[in-house]
A protein has these predicted regions:
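Short, polar loop motifs at secondary-structure junctions
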Residues: 32-35, 53-55, 71-72, 221-225, ...
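Acidic-glycine-rich active-site phosphate/pyrophosphate-binding loop
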Residues: 251-269
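General beta-strand structural signal in soluble alpha/beta enzymes
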Residues: 28-31, 50-51, 88-91, 108, ...
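Generic structural signal for helix capping and beta-alpha/helix-loop junctions
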Residues: 37, 59, 98, 142-143, ...
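Phosphate-binding loop of NTP-binding sites
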Residues: 19-22, 43, 57-60, 69, ...
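C-terminal accessory "lid"/substrate-recognition subdomains
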Residues: 260, 279-280
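Beta-strand->loop->alpha-helix junctions that form or flank phosphate-binding loops
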Residues: 50-53, 91-96, 134-138, 233-254, ...
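ATP-dependent carboxylate-amine ligase
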Residues: 1-34, 43-49, 61, 65, ...
């Protein structure tokens, strides 16, 4: 079958393309911006990529067009597909029909921690000999790829609540039909498609409805929003983590790099790893619990996590120059920002932390979280806020609310120079954005190298 993918360079669609190729299909695709690393990865799989959306790419017609959720009416290829009655579907629907319907699906959902927890779970299964397939929104550190078919019935998928396509406004995850479902947490996000938290809760309950009676749902006991979702009806076995839950963690180190795992009042394992932060301890509990549902004992899961390499862009050290460390993190929501900073603070103690933030997500651009942003940055000693052209509100408003020194700029080169000037030996620079941030990491490392300080 010839499958053509519109919007192929997105993380999800790129992963779907790799899976389609591994299934033996001829795969082509197009996108507005074709660039490495995704373009290189796809081409290495024998996938032809076309830049732009000239409808001529659809002649002769492929057997199926998979339309990414970034595509909308008015796109030349979309209009051609509709006008010529070509067979089309969404990415999540394709995944279900061509792959997931034959698998034991382990889905990881929630506002935060999906990619990291999915990666942990995939690695636990791999390390314990289960050879799972997976599709995750990031490059898995232990695998070097974001998707693979796997050699067993088990398939780990990052279950996103974002909409499926312009013609299917349901959340992606309602297509996945998991037997094992992790719901990590739930807060308001994606203000571009959801009006309020209640709208997201409805989608999460649609997801709960798809889990079979012999399935299992895993969630934190103290998350009020998820408690509300489950109270609307649940027909599957449930296990909970945290206070009053079956699964608990006892930290043996302040930064979360060493902790015990307890199940129903009994210690069942110990994790010692390179990750830090209470949020990662919580993620680990969920991954261990999900792996247990398919047969992995907690002690083996804990041992596997000791060999876990985190996904790129999760407190990833990009380099260290003259004693100044530069980290990259995907955090783009106040809760994630606060947790990431807390993890770094516990790791480095009293060392100076400079938080560098680009408010780039669709929700951030609308200013939805700007009132809580300053408080989320409280663990930083200094704050640098970038003013992208694409947002209508001023980051100066957030800077004014910060208790620590806070600086703003709309010029990336001046911004980098100012950060480098404030750094000294021992400083930890944490860059947070869900985009490329105009290559700031490389620019910072260059500026630090050129610095005489």
């Amino acid at each position: 079958m010839h499958i053509h993918i519109l919007g192929i360079c997105g993380t999800f669609m790129g992963g779907a393309a790799i899976l389609a190729r591994q299934l033996g299909h001829k795969v082509t695709g197009s996108d507005a911006n074709v660039y490495p690393p995704m373009s290189t990865l796809l081409e290495s799989q024998g996938i032809e990529i076309i830049e732009g959306f000239d409808p001529s790419q659809l002649n002769p017609a492929p057997d199926l067009v998979v339309i990414g959720n970034a595509m909308s009416r008015g796109n030349p290829c979309v209009e051609y597909v509709l006008n010529h009655n070509l067979r089309y579907t969404s990415g999540p629907q394709w995944l279900q029909e061509f792959l997931l319907h034959e698998r034991w699906v382990l889905a990881v959902s929630g506002t935060h921690g999906k990619t990291t927890t999915s990666s942990m779970l995939a690695w636990i299964l791999e390390d314990c000999g289960y050879q799972p397939g997976f599709l995750v929104g990031g490059v898995l550190g232990n695998f070097g790829v974001s998707a693979r078919l796997g050699e067993s019935m088990f398939f780990v998928v990052e279950a996103d609540e974002y909409d499926s396509a312009f013609f299917d406004k349901r959340s992606k995850f309602v297509h996945y039909h998991p037997r094992t479902l992790i719901m990590n947490n739930l807060e308001f996000d994606h203000a571009d498609i959801f009006d309020d938290l209640e709208a997201i809760k409805r989608q999460f309950h649609h997801l709960v409805r798809t889990v079979p009676g012999n399935g299992r749902i895993l969630a934190p006991k103290q998350d009020a929003a998820l408690t509300d979702v489950l109270s609307r009806g649940c027909w599957s076995d449930q296990e909970f983590s945290g206070q009053d839950g079956e699964w608990q963690a006892v930290k043996l180190s302040k930064d979360g790099s060493h902790f015990e795992v307890w199940l129903q009042g009994e210690q069942v394992g110990t994790v010692q790893w390179d990750l830090v932060g209470d949020h990662n301890v919580d993620n680990a509990l969920m991954a261990i619990a999900a792996a247990r549902h398919v047969g992995v004992t907690p002690d083996l899961a804990c041992e596997a996590l000791g060999r876990f390499i985190n996904t790129k862009r999760r407190l990833e050290l990009k380099g260290e120059i003259n004693g100044v460390a530069v980290y990259d993190d995907f955090a783009h929501h106040p809760t994630a920002i606060e947790l990431t900073l807390a993890g770094l603070r516990n790791k480095v103690g009293d060392k100076k932390i400079i938080a560098v933030l680009e408010p780039r997500s669709a929700t951030m651009k609308r200013g939805v979280h700007k009132e809580t942003l300053a408080a989320s940055l409280k663990q930083a000693d200094e704050v640098f806020l970038y003013q992208p052209e694409s947002i209508a509100w001023s980051v100066q408003d957030v800077a004014a609310q910060c208790q620590q020194p806070a600086f703003t700029s709309d010029n990336i080169d001046q911004f980098v120079a100012n950060i480098a000037q404030r750094a000294e030996a021992g400083t930890q620079i944490l860059v947070m954005s869900n985009g490329g941030f105009e290559g700031i990491h490389g620019k910072l490392l260059t500026a630090l190298e050129n610095s005489t300080r």
